[in-house]
Amino acid sequence: MRSVRGRSTATAALVAISLLALPSGTTATADPAGAATLVVLGDSFTATAPVLGHADDGCARSPNSWPNKLATSTRLSGTAGFVDVSCNGGTIDTGNGWTLVHQTRKAHAQGAFGSDTRAVLIQAGLNDIWGASSGTAFPSTDCLLDIVEGCGLDAAEQNRLPDYHAVTGATYADRVREVVTFVRYYAPNARVALVGYPEIFPPGQPAACMDLAVVGRVVQPRAEGYIAYLDRLQDAQRAAAQLLGIEFVDVRAITAGHASCSEEPWISGLAGADSPFDGAPVHPNAQGNGAVAVQVRQRFGL
C-alpha cells in the first residue's frame, strides 16, 4: 500500500501532466473503479504498424502485434479491459506527435487507469532525439540505409543518428518520470514496466543485414553507430526501470538469436509472409511478437 507521503509527492508531481491529461470539464479522481486490466503505450515496435494500414485515430495496429496477441491470449481483446494507445512514430517526448504524455492523456480519457489496472507496459525511446544530435533512428534512410556514408560511430556527430553517448539510465528515467508518476497515482495496484526492444541486429558486430522486397538482402557494412545506439538504449531502459522502482521486460533476451537475416528471423523484411499490410521492415514479425506475448503473460500473471 502506498503511503500518504508518497501520494502527496505524486500529487505535486502530477500538476503539469494533469493539465494535459484531462479533457476540459473533467474532474480527476484517483483510483477509479472499472478501469482496464492491461494498458499499453508505445511506438511502432509495439503497434507493429502496417505500412499500408489505416486506423481512425491515425495509429494503425497489427492484429499480430505483441499487445494484441497478449490481449487475445488473455481474452481481453475487444473488451474495456484492454487499452492499447501505441502508435507508429511514438516517442517519449520528441516532436509534437504521439508522445507518452499524449498517449497517457488518450488512455486516461478512455478510463484506462484505476485500482483494477494490473499492468501498464511502456515501450518507447527508439524514435527520440538524444543529446545534441538531431538525428533519429527511424526512418533509417539517413543512416542505416545510407550505403555511401554508412551508420558508423561518426553518424551522431553528423546528425544522422541519435547521440548514443547521451542515452543513459538517468536521462531516460528523467524523461519518463512524469508519465510513470501519473500512472502510479491513478493505477496504484498496477505493475508498471518499461518494455525493451527485440534483437534487431546481433550486438557486438560492425554490420547490419536487412531483407527488403525487390532489392533483396542489403548489408550495411558500417553500422557500428546504430548497433551502439541499440545497446545503449537497452542498458538505459534497464537502469531507468531500477531508478524509478518499476520493472523492465528484457525483450532482447526473449528474441535472442532471431535477429534480422538470421536462420529464423523474428525481425521482418518486406516480402512473403512479411506483408506490408501486416508490419514494417526492420520491425518484429508475428513469430517474434508471439514469443514476447507469451513471456509477458507469464511474467505478469495475466
Give the positions of each predicted feature.
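Short amphipathic alpha-helices and their capping/turn segments at secondary-structure boundaries
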Residues: 25-38, 99-120, 178-191, 297
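Structural recognition of the beta-strand scaffold that forms the well-ordered cores
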Residues: 37-42, 46-48, 81-86, 118-123, ...
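A structural motif corresponding to the C-terminal end of an alpha-helix
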Residues: 71-78, 174-193, 229-250
